[in-house]
């Protein structure tokens, strides 16, 4: 939900977290009313460089992190907990000892600019306008030149800055200036010394805790998610492997074949041309055969994104 008053005032966004954009200063002010509450933070590129050999393409996802805001003195810190080393013991002190034995990562620190009874306001502009995706590093590693972020040529991009009930989205225009090397950047950039992309930040609400982990089976052909559980019995492996999978439950658990409570749906960009669009739908729907063998009916769908749907809304 967005409300705007005038050019000289603020544009307010109401959603998973409320924030405002000041038209005069160009700053984003975020309101935090749930400290120490975990959510997902994802960065990506909403506009890329255009050369596949660079690997900086439109829509490329960066890191996905579980994070939370916490207060320390006059600061709000964005912290990424260590989820690789855990203890699932019924003993609180054992869990606490393992938690304190391994490092966390503070991703950013913010000064508190306003405090109310139930919330804090912080300026997150500097957090957004930074090279979170590692563009300059990728350019350097690919021997394409030495670039640094030029903040005077970077700004918040409101076209893709939105708020929804379960997620908030921020988009920024970033310009990197430097000296290109080779032809990879020159071939796709009007002025190779000034390379401009758009970087996206997503804050997403986590689902409920009803998801059930499943041990990894190497026959699945998938990659495992690995954690080290210090509460495992002494004769068991410290390393625990779990399969990365969709959350899928039968609507009628007692039936041999049942529709799912919620199907898995992959959406195709409605700008995809034919015959590519039809081929993607037909090919993707073949997966339903595998799900039917596992006892599910119409559990996997490939659909064209509806014209009135916003792809940034996680719902």
Give, region by region, the residue ranges found by the protein language model.
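Bacterial Sec-dependent N-terminal signal peptides
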Residues: 1-9
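Auxiliary tRNA-acceptor-end handling modules of aminoacyl-tRNA synthetases
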Residues: 9-272, 290, 305-315
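Zn2+-dependent metallopeptidase catalytic core
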Residues: 37, 271-299
């Amino acid at each position: 939900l967005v409300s705007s008053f005038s050019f000289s005032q603020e544009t307010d966004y109401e959603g998973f977290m409320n924030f405002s954009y000041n038209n005069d200063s160009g700053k984003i002010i975020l309101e935090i009313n749930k400290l120490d509450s975990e959510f997902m933070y994802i960065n990506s590129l909403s506009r890329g460089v255009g050369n596949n050999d660079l690997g900086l393409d439109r829509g490329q996802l960066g890191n996905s992190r579980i994070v939370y805001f916490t207060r320390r003195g006059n600061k709000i810190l964005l912290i990424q907990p260590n989820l690789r080393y855990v203890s699932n013991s019924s003993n609180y002190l054992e869990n606490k000892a393992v938690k304190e034995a391994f490092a966390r990562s503070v991703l950013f620190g913010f000064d508190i600019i306003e405090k109310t009874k139930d919330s804090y306001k912080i300026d997150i502009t500097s957090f957004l306008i930074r090279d979170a995706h590692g563009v300059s590093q990728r350019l350097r590693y690919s021997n394409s030149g030495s670039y640094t972020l030029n903040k005077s040529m970077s700004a918040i991009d409101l076209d893709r800055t939105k708020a929804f009930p379960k997620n908030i989205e921020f988009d920024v225009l970033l310009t990197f200036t430097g000296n290109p090397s080779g032809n990879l950047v020159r071939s796709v950039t009007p002025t190779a010394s000034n390379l401009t992309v758009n970087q996206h930040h997503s804050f997403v609400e986590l689902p409920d805790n009803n998801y059930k982990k499943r041990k990894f089976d190497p026959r699945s052909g998938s990659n495992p998610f690995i954690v080290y559980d210090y509460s495992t019995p002494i004769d068991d492996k410290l390393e625990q492997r779990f399969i990365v999978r969709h959350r899928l439950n039968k609507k009628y658990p007692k039936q041999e074949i049942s529709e799912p409570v919620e199907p898995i749906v992959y959406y195709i960009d409605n700008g995809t041309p034919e015959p590519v669009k039809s081929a993607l739908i037909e090919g993707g729907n073949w997966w339903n055969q595998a799900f039917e063998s596992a006892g599910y009916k119409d559990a996997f769908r490939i659909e064209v994104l509806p014209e009135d749907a916003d792809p940034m809304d996680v719902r």
